[in-house]
Curated annotation (Swiss-Prot):
GO terms for molecular function: RNA binding; RNA endonuclease activity. Its EC number is 3.1.-.-. Its main location: membrane. PANTHER family: RIBONUCLEASE Y. Pfam families: HD, RNase_Y_N. One of its GO terms (cellular component) is plasma membrane. Residues 333-426 form the HD domain. This is Ribonuclease Y. Belongs to the RNase Y family. The gene is rny.
Amino acid sequence: MIESLIALIAAIVGLGIGYLVAKKINDAKYEIFVEQAKAKAKAIEYEAELILKDAKNSILNAELEVKKKYEEKTHKIQKDFNQKFDDLSKKEQKLQQEEEKLKEDKEYLCKSQKHIQDLQSDVDKLKNKYQEKLDDVLKILEHSTGLTQNEAKEIILKKVEENSREQIAHIVRKYEEEAKNEAKRKANFIIAQATSRFAGEFAAERLINVINIKNDELKGRIIGKEGRNVKTLEMVLGVDIIIDDTPGAIIVSCFNLYRRAIATKVIELLVEDGRIQPARIEEIHEKVCKEFDSAILEEGETIVMDLGLNKIHPEIVKLIGKLKYRASYGQNALAHSLEVAHLAGIIAAECGGDENLARRAGILHDIGKALTHDFEGSHVDLGAELCKRYKEHPVVINAIYAHHGHEEATSIESAAVCAADTLSAARPGARREVLEAFLKRVSELEDIAKSKEGIKNAYAINAGREIRVIANAQLVNDDESVLLAKEIAAEIQEKMQYPGEIKVNVIRELRAVEYAK
């Protein structure tokens, strides 16, 4: 029984100890749980603070962005407003000038009317005076000659008519001279205004370009083995390449500005690259030609934008850029056309015409010069046909014809273009007749060679003393090349006048290319 009691007491003690241990464990777990809960709460609170901070930053950034956009929009609106205000101010100023001009014209008209009234009064007085004298003379004649009044009246009237005709002719001649002098004075004033308001740049075109090189070793590489590279360059580029004892320089000579510019760029790229060989020359030449086509279009677009013109066909825009590489009597065609455009606009505005239309006609009046190397015909006919094809304004077409006297100028704008063309061309030093005659002669040389069947291209070199003709190897054989050279030489002798002799050099080259795959 004692053992049972001891066992019971032990069980109770064990249960008490177990309860205490369990309670302590539960208390520890509870404390851990509370700590974890607090940690989670702090983490959530921290995360909430971060979210709130991000939200505040987002709101602040949004406010700044909205404020920035608002300021930009406000600035743009203010800028547009200022621009429109300036435009309105200019228009208002122009209207005031026109109003002043109208007032001056009105005053002049009033003075003219008063002058006419005074003249009419003088005529009436003279008429009355002549009538009185006529009556007196009739009485004297009747008394002294025995003539009837009608007969005497006829004699007197005839005499008076003769005297009156002389006086009227004198008055008419006087007013005609005054009108001519006034018109001449006004024309001189308008031309003086136009030339004083426009100052164009002018630089004489050269027939050579000088390329600077670092050392004379490059000259040898450009010449190549047995002159292979320089021959390829001259054949592909169609220019004369002069390599002499001049230190650090190679000269590119050609009458064609476009070919000379391309040749200069090709040689500069080859010198920079260092790989100078026939295949590389052709590769660089093809690349430069594409770049020049893009540059020409860009040049035309810049000119059109600077002149404030619109709705010009892209093909015409490209030809405007191409005028940069054309010259007439030593004067650059694009520079000349720009001068004419600006001067024509000013003259037309002074005469009450459309300034914008006059500038359009001015820039396009010589557009045919961009086509003369590729098509037959005068630049006037080529330019007019081009503008008709692309539906240009009739005033533009009339200006193209009128500036060389093919038609009469039918508008203020056309007349302004004719006057501006004369001003630009007649300016001292603007043109050189001898140079133009030389360019015409070498162009004729190339045209004669190109007119033959089977000819791919032709280049006049050595100042026109040699014509290099590139034959199509698939259309012309070796025997026909000899005949072609003789035919071209014979036609040159028949159609042209020149000092010394001209060498005709027909080149036929056949290339077979295949790729191993």
